[in-house]
A protein has these predicted regions:
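Conserved short loop/turn motifs at secondary-structure junctions
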Residues: 83-86, 163-165, 236-245, 254-260, ...
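C-terminal or mid-to-C-terminal helical accessory/interaction module adjacent to the motor/catalytic core
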Residues: 66, 75, 117-201, 236-240
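Amphipathic alpha-helical transducer elements in NTP-driven molecular machines
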Residues: 14-17, 21, 58-69, 74, ...
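Metal- or metallocofactor-binding catalytic centers and their adjacent structured scaffolds
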Residues: 214-247, 253, 438, 515
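Short, polar/flexible loop-turn hinges at active-site or ligand-entry regions and domain interfaces
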Residues: 53-56, 84, 104-108, 129-136, ...
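Intrinsically disordered, low-complexity regulatory segments
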Residues: 1-144, 148, 317, 410, ...
Length: 655
């Protein structure tokens, strides 16, 4: 192989191997086009639709680009092998460099889903010419131009319209809109009390249907207490829970967030590291199945997982359950590789070890028998009213025997005793008080699910997804929302900031429509599969941008953007004036000097600061050490004046 290490590449055995560091070449920004686009933002510049798209070399990686250019154009190099990630972005990363370097040498494509030596050797013997992947590139290039057109035009259009800087994104804005809507549902929820009449039959309890009026519930309880209930129906049905599908990236990110609290980006990073370490297959996949040619490999790997992950349970894998060629377009589901047999798994970092365990467990579960149980529903009549109880008895644990604490499932219903129709019980009746449950704020788990389902409300689980973004880009979308200050993390929850709410409030529905963006994603998939010319898609995007600029190309003075969302977080404990968020933190509008910037170098979130002004403690972690912060108002012993401070485990931070 190419084992002679040089600066920026390796060489040997007739090969030169080098690499890209992300996107070495990308689309130029509007300011680089001239056309007046580099002037102060105005409606007259819009819409910005380049006649010829221009590319630029990324400054931070220019040296690596120049190296690749020189290597490609060396006289002794007769053929190029593209070995970037086998997906849209990988195709674009290579072709942008190849085209910018004006290289015209023949190219073959190395398409691999595993970095094991055996997989690479097999792929090397099955390479196709670059032209076989033109549709993949067309989809990636169309996606990049669509993002540019929506983002660059939308940001300038609505920033000028409302007189403040707004960042618009083709996927980012609809995702933010979903978070804002969920937060509004949570904040606007009014819990409602309801009741059930519960009949204690000794070994089990029968309950009435929901009763909204407490007096009616009390009357039913009084009528039934000490009375006899007669079992009118005993329904038993053997049911099965099918084994779960294998992981695609999104389901892996969701379950890792649920089990370990990992962000989508953390899970992608851990899985990418495992992939580069030859321990799992390609991570950025949207398939939950394997292809026919993977059957024998999957069987061998499943047996390895049984051995190396200490399940110790007899298991005959049914590999055919996870084989479906029609569900694998680019890459198959994520599974471990045979590399786990020789690797020192104990030396893996905790995050990677946890992710590998999830992936191995999923392969075991997916090839295991169904979980079977006997579902029972009892119905009883007391004083003319129907009461019910449900339970289940496990008949065969099946795949669930392999579930560990990483899959924090809800406990199954308890088994009910053997009861016959016509049997009677003397009961003690009580009034059960309940409350309706509020909608929950998004976590990365539930947001990823919502992004995946967006635009798919009328489709079943096995229909090809549209969704917001792709498995490869959803993590970056969430991170961008957080980085730009539109969303903040509050524990596992993702909450919209005032800045995020403001943006969603002012932009029109067509810009924040999840359905429209999902339809665009569906069209990109059609381009990738050769079912739609990319020119048709781009024409539609250009018409959308032109119409949007025409419709909203005027100043709207009815809306005034705040500077960072200046909604008061509380009253100043020193002078009583409003405390608001500014560019450098929170400050008192009464100018008494009270401010909150950072506590021990850590910037608190909007939610944490609001909590402090409500008298609540909050906590943060810095350099691995957790610190509790609580507000205090104390008297200065030297002048008798009251002042505000933070009381923490590591000392005081005066405000």
């Amino acid at each position: 192989g190419a084992d002679a290490t040089k600066k920026g590449y390796t060489e040997g055995n007739g090969y030169i191997v080098s690499w890209c560091v992300g996107h070495l070449v990308g689309l130029k920004f509007p300011n680089d086009y001239g056309n007046g686009w580099n002037q102060k933002w105005s409606f007259s510049q819009l819409p910005m639709i380049p006649d010829n798209w221009l590319f630029q070399i990324t400054d931070s990686t220019k040296a690596q680009y120049n190296l690749l250019k020189n290597l490609m154009n060396k006289d002794e190099v007769t053929e190029i092998i593209c070995a970037t990630d086998a997906d849209r972005e990988g195709e674009c990363i290579f072709r942008y460099v190849y085209n910018m370097a004006r290289c015209r040498k023949p190219v073959k494509r190395l398409w691999v889903s595993s970095l094991e030596e055996s997989a690479i050797r097999k792929a090397l013997s099955n390479m196709k010419p670059m032209s076989a992947y033109d549709n993949l590139f067309n989809a990636g290039y169309a996606r990049a131009r669509a993002d540019w057109l929506v983002g660059m035009n939308g940001s300038r259009l609505f920033s000028v319209r409302y007189g403040g800087k707004l960042n618009i994104g083709r996927v980012q804005t609809p995702t933010l809109a979903m978070i804002v809507q969920r937060d509004a549902e949570v904040n606007g929820f009014v819990k409602q009390k309801y009741f059930t009449a519960d009949l204690n039959c000794g070994a089990f309890t029968l309950s009435s249907a929901r009763i909204d009026d407490e007096k009616s519930a009390d009357a039913l309880v009084s009528a039934c207490d000490g009375s006899t209930v007669t079992i009118s129906s005993v329904k038993r049905e053997v049911k099965t829970d099918k084994a779960p599908k294998l992981y695609d990236l999104t389901t892996l990110q969701r379950e890792a967030n649920k089990a370990f609290g990992y962000t989508a980006q953390q899970t992608l990073d851990y899985t990418q590291s495992l992939y580069e370490g030859k321990l799992v297959t390609y991570p950025r996949t949207d398939s939950q199945y394997l292809s026919d040619d993977m059957a024998q490999t999957a069987l061998e790997v499943t047996k390895l997982c049984d051995s190396y992950f200490g399940f110790g349970i007899a298991h005959t894998p049914d590999i055919q359950k996870v084989i479906n060629n029609s569900k694998v377009s680019g890459h198959h589901a994520i599974i471990p590789t045979s590399g786990i047999a020789t690797a020192d798994l104990s030396s893996l970092p905790t995050g990677e070890k946890n992710i590998l365990t999830l992936i191995a467990t999923k392969l075991i579960c997916a090839t295991a028998p169904a979980h079977k149980y006997d579902a029972v529903k009892l119905t009883g009549i007391c004083n003319g009213t129907e009461f019910t109880a449900t339970g289940r008895t496990v008949l065969d644990m099946g795949w669930k025997r392999f579930i560990r604490q990483t899959d924090k499932e809800k406990p199954d219903e308890k088994a009910l005793p053997a009861v016959s129709e016509g049997q009677t019980f003397t009961v003690a009746a009580s009034n059960g008080e309940h409350f309706t449950s509020p909608p929950k704020p998004y976590t990365e788990d539930t947001l990823l699910s919502a992004m995946e389902r967006a635009g798919n409300e009328d489709y079943d689980d096995d229909t090809e997804k549209k969704g917001l973004g792709t498995p490869a880009t959803r993590a970056a979308t969430i991170e961008s929302l957080v980085k730009n200050g539109y969303v903040e993390r509050d524990g596992k929850q993702l909450r919209a900031t005032d800045k995020g709410k403001e943006l969603v409030t002012v932009v029109p529905d067509e810009v924040k429509s999840a359905k429209l963006t999902a339809e665009w994603e569906s069209k990109l998939q059609q381009i990738e599969h050769g079912e739609l010319p990319e020119t048709v898609f781009m024409s539609g995007i250009q018409h959308f941008i032109t119409d949007m600029c025409r419709k909203y190309g005027s100043v709207d003075k009815s809306v005034s953007l705040s500077d960072g969302g200046n909604e008061p977080v509380g009253k100043c404990p020193k002078c009583g004036a409003d405390v608001v968020k500014g560019k450098f933190g929170w400050y008192c509008k009464g100018k008494c000097g009270m401010n909150i910037a950072k506590v021990y170098g850590v910037e608190l979130s909007d939610t944490q600061v609001k909590g402090l002004f409500d008298g609540k403690s909050t906590s943060y972690t810095s350099k691995g050490k957790k610190t509790i912060v609580r507000p205090e108002i104390v008297e200065n012993p030297y002048n008798g004046k009251m002042y505000y401070q933070w009381k923490t485990e590591r000392g005081n931070k005066n405000g």
